[in-house]
Amino acid sequence: DILLGLMKRLIKHRASDLKVLITSATLDGLKVSNFFSGCPVLNIPGTIFPVEKFYSTDRPTNYIESSLRTAIDIHVKEAPGDVLIFMTGKDDIDKMVSKLEERIQNLEEGSCMDALVLPLHGSLPPEQQVRVFSPAPPNCRRFIVATNVAETSLTVDGVVFVVDCGYVKQRQYNPSTGMYSLDVVEISRVQADQRAGRAGRTRPGKCYRLYPSSIYQKEFL
């Protein structure tokens, strides 16, 4: 926001030789255009397949456990396809990966296909991050447990199901203490849409939102 404000000020002084190109997968193009005195907007649509969305009746008290149950239900009941599970950070991802691997091992043998659980976050070494781009072995479903890095930064082929806990970890400034902290906060509506869209990149998919539709409509900004 600060950068856009500075660019608008610079344009007034250097309109003849300063050209600004803003690209984004999430910004509201009309708002940005109005802010920059009605500048043109170019839309480059991608191929998006339909995504069916399912909402929880209420907010779960423990989003990790709720995500875990949803992932297991998908594995047992749904057709083949990889699952992308959004968590807030490395600690949540580590817990989710451990619990999911344990729960899958305890499933009745032959009741479902094999499974491969992969974490994805910025702290992973590059050689571990690129594992998510390798296709799943035959008769195997991949579970990719990721931070918001998987919202817009990359597309993972094979993802058909998305589990969205509705939270993200963000850097917040506390004016009373003058310090920053990493806090778990609700995602925005744009982020929710981006997460759901991950399920429709290569074929029709499903998104399981662990919050009611009323929260998406009224509370997400």
Describe each model-derived feature in a short phrase.
Residues 1-221:
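P-loop NTPase motor module signature
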